[in-house]
C-alpha cells in the first residue's frame, strides 16, 4: 500500500519532470555540462563555495562556456574575455539586458522596478537616464566632493586616536562608504561620530545586512516552482524586510520633502518631480535610494580592505605609492580628487585590486529575452547567464603572472581599455547593464586609499602575512578582517589643526 501511495506517484512525477525538460532542450545545441546531474535538483549538489572558484575549475574541464541545471532553471557560465565580448556588444548586449527574477527582488525592489532589477524596456531606460544625467553625472558627483572629503577626514581622525595600536579596518571603511552614500542621498550621517539618529542607524544597518544575506538565489522556489508552496517562512521574512526598508525610505523621503532647501540627491529628484511627476514617482525615487544605499556601500569598503591588505603584503608597492604622493603632493596639504590624474601608480593599485578581488566576482546575472548564440552554442531565452569576471581577471592568456599583485602591469597597457580588451577588466560589468555607480566607486576608493597612504605609515601586526582568503558569499569579502598598525605622518598634525580651526 505504501508503495502505491508514495513511491509510485513520486516515480511518475520524476519521470514526467525529466521528459518535460528533455523535450524542451533537445532542439538546442547547449554548452557542455558536468555529469552527475540529480533528478529535479540538477547540479545543486556541485555548488561548493566559493562559487567563482568552483566555476573556474569546471571551466578547465568543460571549456570557457558551460551550462548547469538548477531545478527548472538553466544557467550558462562564461569564463573567457572573447565570449564576454560576444555577450556585452552588439545585438546580444540588448538581448541580454534582462535580469533573472528572484523572490527577494520581487518584494525588496518594488516588484522589479529598480534600476538594478527592472526588465529591459522604457522604464529601465528612464531609470538609467536619471542615474546618468541627474544623480551620478560628473557635475553632480563634483557637487558632493565635500562629503567624500569630510568623511575621509573623519576616518583619518579616528585612526589617529589609535596609532601604534592594532586596528581593525573593516568597521572604519564600512562607516566611510555608508556615510558617504547616505549623506549624498539624504543628508544624514548614520555611522561613526555625530550620527543623526543612532537607533534608526542601527535598524538601517541591520536591514541592509539582512537584505544582502537574502539577495540572489536563496529560495528553492526560485529554481523549483512547485517548492514555492513550501517556502512560506522565507517569503514572510523577505516581505517583512521589504516593509521595514520601505518604511525607512518613506520616512527619509518625507523628511526631504519638508526640507525643501536641502542639497541632496533626493531633494534634486523631488524638484524634478514637480515638472515630470510621471517619471519621478515616489516609488521610483525610493527605488533609486534603495539601489544607491545597498549597491553603493559595501562594494567600496570591500575593495579598500583588499587594497590595504595587498599593500601590506607587498611593502615595496606601498613604499612606491607613498613616494609618488610625497613627490607630487608632499606633506603640506591633503590629497584631493583633482590630484588623482597625476598619480598613475595609485590608479594602478586600484586597478590591480579590482582585477584580483572584484567585489562581485560573477557580476550580476543576466537573462536573454530571446534565443541567442554564444561561442557557437545556443543560449535559450530565460537562461541565467553568469560571467565569471574573477576567472577572466586571472586568465594567463590575458595577464602575465595573473596570480601576482603587480600594479606595474597597467603601465604598459596590459589592462586593456579599448575594443575587446575592455572585457579583460570589468569589475563593474560591461554593456548596457554595467554598474551606473562605477565612477563614484572609483572616486571614493582612490581618494580614500591615497589618503590612508599619505597620512600614515602602515605595518603588519607581528610582521605576519595578511591572509587573503575570501568568504564564500556572493560579495567577495575577506574571510579574516584586516588588522594593522599605523603611525601618523606629519600631514596629520596639519589636518587636525585645520579641523580644530
Swiss-Prot record:
Pathway: Secondary metabolite biosynthesis. The lineage of its organism: Eukaryota, Viridiplantae, Streptophyta, Embryophyta, Tracheophyta. Its cofactor is heme. Involved in indole glucosinolate biosynthesis. Catalyzes hydroxylation reactions of the glucosinolate indole ring. Converts indol-3-yl-methylglucosinolate (I3M) to 4-hydroxy-indol-3-yl-methylglucosinolate (4OH-I3M) and/or 1-hydroxy-indol-3-yl-methylglucosinolate (1OH-I3M) intermediates. These hydroxy intermediates are converted to 4-methoxy-indol-3-yl-methylglucosinolate (4MO-I3M) and 1-methoxy-indol-3-yl-methylglucosinolate (1MO-I3M) by indole glucosinolate methyltransferase 1 and 2 (IGMT1 and IGMT2). One of its GO terms (molecular function) is heme binding. It is an enzyme of class 1 (oxidoreductase). Belongs to the cytochrome P450 family. It is a single-pass membrane protein. PANTHER family: CYTOCHROME P450 82C3-RELATED (PTHR47947), CYTOCHROME P450, FAMILY 81, SUBFAMILY D, POLYPEPTIDE 5 (PTHR47947:SF62). Heme binds at residue 435. It comes from the Eukaryota. GO terms for cellular component: membrane. InterPro entries: Cyt_P450, Cyt_P450_CS, Cyt_P450_E_grp-I, Cyt_P450_sf, Plant_Cytochrome_P450_Monoox. Pfam families: p450. The keyword Transmembrane helix applies. Gene3D superfamilies: Cytochrome P450. One of its GO terms (biological process) is indole glucosinolate metabolic process. It is found in: Membrane. This is Cytochrome P450 81F3. Keywords: Heme, Iron, Membrane, Metal-binding, Monooxygenase, Oxidoreductase, Transmembrane, Transmembrane helix. Coiled coil: none annotated. It comes from Arabidopsis thaliana. The chain crosses the membrane at residues 288-308.
Amino acid at each position: 500500500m505504501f508503495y502505491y501511495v508514495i513511491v509510485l506517484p513520486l516515480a511518475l512525477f520524476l519521470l514526467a519532470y525529466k521528459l518535460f525538460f528533455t523535450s524542451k532542450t533537445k532542439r538546442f545545441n547547449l554548452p557542455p555540462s558536468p555529469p552527475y546531474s540529480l533528478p529535479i535538483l540538477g547540479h545543486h549538489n556541485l555548488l561548493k563555495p566559493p562559487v567563482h572558484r568552483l566555476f573556474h575549475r569546471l571551466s578547465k574541464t568543460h571549456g570557457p562556456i558551460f551550462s548547469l541545471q538548477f531545478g527548472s532553471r538553466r544557467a550558462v557560465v562564461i569564463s573567457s574575455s572573447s565570449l564576454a565580448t560576444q555577450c556585452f556588444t552588439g545585438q546580444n548586449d540588448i538581448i541580454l539586458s534582462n535580469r533573472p527574477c528572484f523572490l527577494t527582488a520581487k518584494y525588496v525592489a518594488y516588484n522589479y522596478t529598480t534600476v538594478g532589477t527592472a526588465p529591459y524596456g522604457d522604464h529601465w531606460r528612464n531609470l538609467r537616464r536619471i542615474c546618468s544625467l541627474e544623480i551620478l553625472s560628473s557635475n553632480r558627483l563634483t557637487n558632493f566632493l565635500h562629503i567624500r572629503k569630510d568623511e575621509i577626514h573623519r576616518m583619518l581622525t579616528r585612526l589617529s586616536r589609535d596609532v601604534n595600536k592594532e586596528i581593525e579596518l573593516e568597521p572604519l571603511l564600512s562607516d566611510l562608504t555608508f556615510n558617504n552614500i547616505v549623506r549624498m542621498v539624504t543628508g544624514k550621517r548614520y555611522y561613526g561620530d555625530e550620527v543623526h539618529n543612532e537607533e534608526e542607524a542601527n535598524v538601517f544597518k541591520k536591514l541592509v545586512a539582512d537584505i544582502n544575506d537574502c539577495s540572489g538565489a536563496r529560495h528553492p522556489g526560485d529554481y523549483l516552482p512547485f517548492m514555492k508552496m513550501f517556502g512560506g517562512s522565507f517569503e514572510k521574512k523577505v516581505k517583512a524586510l521589504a516593509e521595514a526598508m520601505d518604511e525607512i525610505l518613506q520616512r527619509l523621503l518625507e523628511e526631504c520633502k519638508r526640507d525643501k532647501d536641502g542639497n541632496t540627491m533626493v531633494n534634486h529628484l523631488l524638484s524634478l518631480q514637480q515638472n515630470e511627476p510621471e517619471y519621478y514617482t515616489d516609488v521610483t525615487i525610493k527605488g533609486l535610494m534603495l539601489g544607491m544605499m545597498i549597491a553603493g556601500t559595501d562594494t567600496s569598503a570591500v575593495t579598500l580592505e583588499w587594497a590595504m591588505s595587498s599593500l601590506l603584503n607587498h611593502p615595496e608597492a606601498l613604499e612606491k605609492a607613498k613616494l609618488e604622493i610625497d613627490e607630487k603632493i608632499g606633506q603640506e596639504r591633503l590629497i584631493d580628487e583633482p590630484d588623482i590624474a597625476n598619480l598613475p601608480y595609485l590608479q594602478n593599485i586600484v586597478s590591480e585590486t579590482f582585477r584580483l578581488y572584484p567585489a562581485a566576482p560573477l557580476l550580476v546575472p543576466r537573462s536573454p529575452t530571446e534565443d541567442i548564440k554564444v561561442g557557437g552554442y545556443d543560449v535559450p531565452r530565460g537562461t541565467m547567464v553568469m560571467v565569471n569576471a574573477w576567472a577572466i581577471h586571472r586568465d594567463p592568456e590575458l595577464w602575465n603572472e595573473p596570480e601576482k599583485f603587480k600594479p606595474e602591469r597597467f603601465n604598459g597597457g596590459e589592462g586593456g581599455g579599448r575594443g575587446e580588451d575592455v572585457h579583460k577588466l570589468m569589475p563593474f560589468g560591461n554593456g548596457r547593464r554595467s554598474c551606473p555607480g562605477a565612477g563614484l566607486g572609483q572616486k571614493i576608493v582612490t581618494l580614500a586609499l591615497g589618503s590612508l597612504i599619505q597620512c600614515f605609515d602602515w605595518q603588519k601586526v607581528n610582521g605576519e602575512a595578511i591572509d587573503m582568503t575570501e568568504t564564500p558569499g556572493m560579495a567577495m569579502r575577506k574571510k579574516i578582517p584586516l588588522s594593522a598598525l599605523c603611525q601618523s605622518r606629519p600631514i596629520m598634525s596639519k589636518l587636525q589643526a585645520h579641523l580644530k580651526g
